[in-house]
Amino acid sequence: MGFCSGRCTLLALCALQLVTALERQVFDFLGYQWAPILANFTHIIVVILGLFGTIQYRPRYIVVYVVWAAVWVTWNVFIICFYLEVGGLSKDSELLTFNLSGHRSWWEEHGPGCLHEEEATAGLGALHGQSLVVGAGCAMVHSYVEALHSGLQILLALLGFVYGCYVVSVLTEEEDSFDFIGGFDPFPLYHVNEKPSSLLSKQAYLPA
């Protein structure tokens, strides 16, 4: 009963991780955040692998999911430090876009409660009188929105790590117990195969 509840909980966590990762992937695409896009894509693949391993009772796949959960926690801690500018990191840098574009987080302009103000741009930043749309009066700064997203991912990954380890341990114990019981088979296969060969040897020594 405990294993069933643990397995069902892990399935629910994997499903929830898929939903939240897809939601995050959409907004990272809108903001052209290439590093998070690659990380989210890898995360989605591994979560699907863990989901498959849990359904099909494949502990090796779940082990891959558990190892990735630790990596995913580390990545999201980095994202929190990046947006909260901890450890010398700056949210204004182009680290997450691989210096391919000057885009920022999508939540910077479209956060909850943000009002769009059009500011006339000049110099190299403007082309043919284009204007830059900036979010103003936001109910929550985009840095906190990104940090909350990462915090949710950390929470789900930690829970997935714990339940993944539990399911792997139970499956491994069941496999070991199955092999242990099979080792005491009173009629092993080699005994069955040994009997005809002994009869043939006896027949060879019989006088004609």
UniProtKB/Swiss-Prot annotation:
Can you say where in the cell this protein is located? Cell membrane
Q: Which InterPro entries match?
A: Na/K-Atpase_Interacting
**Membrane topology per the record?**
Multi-pass membrane protein
- Mind telling me which Pfam families this protein's record contains? NKAIN (PF05640)
Q: Which residues cross the membrane?
A: 35-55, 62-82, 151-171
On whether Membrane is a keyword of this UniProt record, the answer is yes
Q: Which residues form the signal peptide?
A: none
The alphabetized UniProt keywords are:
Cell membrane, Membrane, Transmembrane, Transmembrane helix
State the GO CC annotations.
membrane; plasma membrane
Tissue and organ expression note? Ubiquitous. Expressed in multiple regions of the brain such as cerebral cortex, thalamus, hippocampus, olfactory bulb and brainstem as well as in cerebellum with low expression in granular cell layer.
Describe its partners and assembly state.
Interacts with ATP1B1.
Q: Which PANTHER family match?
A: SODIUM_POTASSIUM-TRANSPORTING ATPASE SUBUNIT BETA-1-INTERACTING PROTEIN 4, T-CELL LYMPHOMA BREAKPOINT-ASSOCIATED TARGET 1-RELATED
Know the name of this protein? Sodium/potassium-transporting ATPase subunit beta-1-interacting protein 4
Name the source organism: Mus musculus (Mouse)
**Which gene is transcribed and translated to give this protein?**
Nkain4
